[in-house]
Amino acid sequence: MAFSMLVSLVGTQMQNVAIDWHVWILTRSPLALGLVGLVRVVPIVIFSIVGGLVADRRDRRRVLIVTQSAMTLVALTLGVVTLLGRDTIGLVYLLTACTSAAGAFDNPSRQSLVPRLVPEKDLPGALAILLSGFQVASIGGPALTGLILAGTAGAAPAGASLHGHTGGLALIYFLNAVSFLGVLVTLFTLQTSGEITRAEGAPENPLASLKEGLRFVFTTPILVWTMTLDFFATFFAGSMSLLPIFADQVLKAGPAGYGWLRAAPGIGALIGSVWTSVHSLPRRQGRVFLWAVAVYGAATITFGLSRGFWLTFGALALVGLSDTISTVVRQTVRQLVTPDALRGRMTGVNMIFFMGGPQLGELEAGFVASLFASAALGASVAVVSGGVGTLLVAAFIATRAKVVREYDWSAARPSAWPQEKK
């Protein structure tokens, strides 16, 4: 399953990177790039908690079959409309939103299935290995996207007809559609059941189940604080959608350079995930989490100030490395403190924070950048100010949340839940 998931992730990363470049060549607008984040986050906010509820009440394997099939269909549609020259900005936004909606159901079921496949003692290593696969995809996907775009047409001039300029984009979307096939075959043949055993005293009513999941998350301090820091740090520092501006106007690197810059966080993240998979983190992992977020903010500032390709590349790699270390800590904490029967709902709530933060951050960055006459200057201001905001949030939580500073997962156990009867 790991290999087929890796192939699918490469395809997904290719499409994500291509969407931003697609929007840039259609509009040449920083705000339009920022709106991609809004288009992606709205379905997450609407559907992710429901997706978590579905993951806790239905066979997770079957849910994944439906969601993976839906994302295949969306990728095919994107490829067809792009190839035919019918790729309006509105249609690109709509299909991007459809992918995000499917992901809101896919992610809780996928993440909640992992703890059923490995022993608890191996969970941190398993999560790190999965992150390694994701980061390999985060390197290969953007790099392949840049090479395909550079080898076909690159960016179209502002105001020019785009017919003939988007053949590379169509190819990327078709490749993503094909990449889902291996996962679907694996899911159909997977022997492990995705069904869960409902805990004694757990509510049967879907609305009551939803309330139970929300009550668990928001009455567990370590979950609340880690999700809060995750949201605000990525909200302020979220700026990957502005990379087409940096590649095209600041660094003059073109589509190939754009692909490598988008791959840079994946390279750093791969280093971080491989290291965490073979080395135990020190005690009080909460402090590791806080320092990782601080480095994330500092690297973001460096990225915004840089005017050299390799310094920008290195800063983005450090962004990926620090983010991966914090992600390993966050995900392990959440899985260890959450009972299996509640993992889907917890993951659904977490998706609002985990994915909502960076996507809304893209909108914020695009809006700030659009306030300046020069897209290059506006993008730099947006990124640097976001990095400063991340440092301030990390400092605030470090001083106010002892449960995070002192957290040590060696003492963590899933909470006894539900503790109340219906």
Q: Where would I find each of the regions flagged by the language model?
A:
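Alpha-helical transmembrane-bundle signature of multi-pass membrane transport and export proteins
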Residues: 1-422
